[in-house]
Amino acid sequence: MKDNIELTIFTPEKNIKIGEIKEVITEGLDGDLAILPNHVNMITYLKPTITKYIDLNGNKNNIFTSSGVLKVEDNKVYIICDASEKPEDIDIKRAENAKKRAEERLRNKKEIDVKRAELALFRSIARIKIKEL
């Protein structure tokens, strides 16, 4: 039995190898997920959220992950998503403007893709929240 898990995040633009950690906490379509060492193998969909992980020194870390898929296999956690950003890489003004645009689109529901606007809102809120941590 292993004491750690390995986390890697894949996006179309970059791969982020976090490496060996103690725990990952993220949000699936049905709620929060906590992945610990020796977790059962699984695949699930993810919502845009702040993914948290605890490194080997016990430090809590945060990273934004957009909608995507999480795969757990043999103590390796793979997140495959549209975008992922560390807090220091997030442009807060851009996120706030995206939030305003998404809220405006949802208020004026004529001729819009509601699901797309909701996802844009979720992404912008998660980016704003991670900057506030």
UniProtKB/Swiss-Prot annotation:
Membrane topology: Peripheral membrane protein
Cleaved signal peptide residues: none
Keyword terms: ATP synthesis, Cell membrane, CF(1), Hydrogen ion transport, Ion transport, Membrane, Transport
InterPro entries membership: ATP_F1_dsu/esu_C_sf, ATP_synth_F1_dsu/esu, ATP_synth_F1_dsu/esu_N, ATP_synth_F1_esu_C, ATPsynth_dsu/esu_N
Protein name (Swiss-Prot/TrEMBL): ATP synthase epsilon chain
Subcellular localization: Cell membrane
Gene: atpC
Gene Ontology CC: plasma membrane; proton-transporting ATP synthase complex
Subunit structure: F-type ATPases have 2 components, CF(1) - the catalytic core - and CF(0) - the membrane proton channel. CF(1) has five subunits: alpha(3), beta(3), gamma(1), delta(1), epsilon(1). CF(0) has three main subunits: a, b and c.
TM spans (from-to): none
